[in-house]
């Protein structure tokens, strides 16, 4: 019998993991998202370092239309007061197949959702409780449904609620008051 993984969160991390599992393993999986739908608004641009592009290439990232991506040659770093700290020529780190890449977040989400959207994704699933049951993990949701899984992956972002079910300390992100453009 296949082991089952619950992936909590349908952002870039959760969708990427789901695609990797679908393509390369014998695990069953389900993605759970507390929102009612997947936001595909154009939104912000994101930056992908070469390591992340090399991972995305394993799930056919090269299928994304080349008109929708950009490969900058350098990055300038500034303080919050718009004072330049330094610049970095990032094209030196590129390889033939993995290049520093920028694109709209919605473009990446659209690509990631295509292979898993209908059969592996459940919306409106806000976790109420997580308990152990006979060596497995029972996840109860506020909509009075539940799932019994072998593993849980918290991919619900920096302000993750999933972690609170598994660890006592609160994870607080810190902002260093610097930006890169």
What are these regions (language model features)?
Residues 13, 37, 159:
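Conserved Rossmann-like nucleotide-cofactor binding loop
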Residues 20-42:
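Glycine-rich FAD pyrophosphate-binding loop
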Residues 1-13:
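Beta1/beta-strand and adjacent pyrophosphate-binding region of the FAD-binding site
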Residues 37-55:
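Conserved N-terminal glycine-rich FAD pyrophosphate-binding loop of Rossmann-like flavoproteins
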Residues 10, 45, 101:
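Charged, low-complexity surface patches
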Residues 3-5, 22, 49-181:
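Conserved N-terminal helical subregion
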Residues 8, 32-33, 155-156:
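Active-site flanking residues adjacent to catalytic metal/cofactor-binding acidic residues
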């Amino acid at each position: 019998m296949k082991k089952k993984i619950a992936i909590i969160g349908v952002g870039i991390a959760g969708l990427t993991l789901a695609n990797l599992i679908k393509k390369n393993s014998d695990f069953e999986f389900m993605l759970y998202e507390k929102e009612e739908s997947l936001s595909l608004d154009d939104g912000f641009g994101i930056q992908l370092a070469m390591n992340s592009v090399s991972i995305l290439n394993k799930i056919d990232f090269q299928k994304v239309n080349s008109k929708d991506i950009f490969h900058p040659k350098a990055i300038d770093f500034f303080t919050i007061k718009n004072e330049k700290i330094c610049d970095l020529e990032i094209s030196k780190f590129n390889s033939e197949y993995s290049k520093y890449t920028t694109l709209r977040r919605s473009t990446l989400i659209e690509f990631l959702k295509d292979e898993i959207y209908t059969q592996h994704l459940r919306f409106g699933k806000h976790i109420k409780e997580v308990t152990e049951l006979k060596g497995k993990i029972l996840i109860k949701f506020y909509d009075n449904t539940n799932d019994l899984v072998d593993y849980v992956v918290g991919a619900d972002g920096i302000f993750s609620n999933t972690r609170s079910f598994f660890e006592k300390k609160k994870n607080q992100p810190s902002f260093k008051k610097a930006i890169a453009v």
